[in-house]
Amino acid sequence: MILTVTLNTALDLTYGVPALVPHTSHRVGDISERPGGKGLNVARVLSALGHETVVTGFAGGATGAVLRDLLAGLPPRDALVAVTGNTRRTIAVVDASTGDTTQLNEPGPLVTAGEWAAFLTTYRELLGEADAVALCGSLPPGIHVGAYAELVRLARAADVPVLLDTSGEPLRRGIAARPDLIKPNADELAQLTGSREPLRATRDAR
């Protein structure tokens, strides 16, 4: 089983408009919604390729309920942990005249210490079933910046290969815990190392 972790899950909303014009009202045409966040997107692809996949992270409030209803019809197994706050929404507005997309991302729910502890219990249990784990995306409010480093160490202690896909200080601290793989893009790697030369930045990140 492949485990994907999305601490800051999202309900992805996409609105299609004929043309996005500032300072005007728009009539939305096409509307779609789906479970989102990096780890959920990874799980969706892995499931489509035939891999047994489990998703964990946080979901809460009315938005989280919609997200979990949508997950119920998909192959990844839902092992999300409930929180009191509302799961965030990401809103993509697609301009049909240009094909351009404008993205709006909410910050996510405030996760309490008790909710984090409940997640760690679930995570440890799932590691016992996992052949690999992918830790993906941003951290919601309330989660300490070294959270991914903690999760990497737990995976390594369980002898489970771990991939880390995040950015900024959570990535820097996560790398120090020695994940098996990291997946920064060019901007994230430059932010981490101060270099925009890919080979040098990769060496510096190590």
Residue ranges and their predicted role:
Residues 1-56, 65-66:
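Glycine-rich phosphate/adenosyl-contacting loop at the front of the ribokinase-like
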Residues 47-131:
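Conserved N-terminal subdomain of the carbohydrate kinase-like
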Residues 7-11, 59-60, 85-87, 188:
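Glycine-rich beta-alpha junction loops
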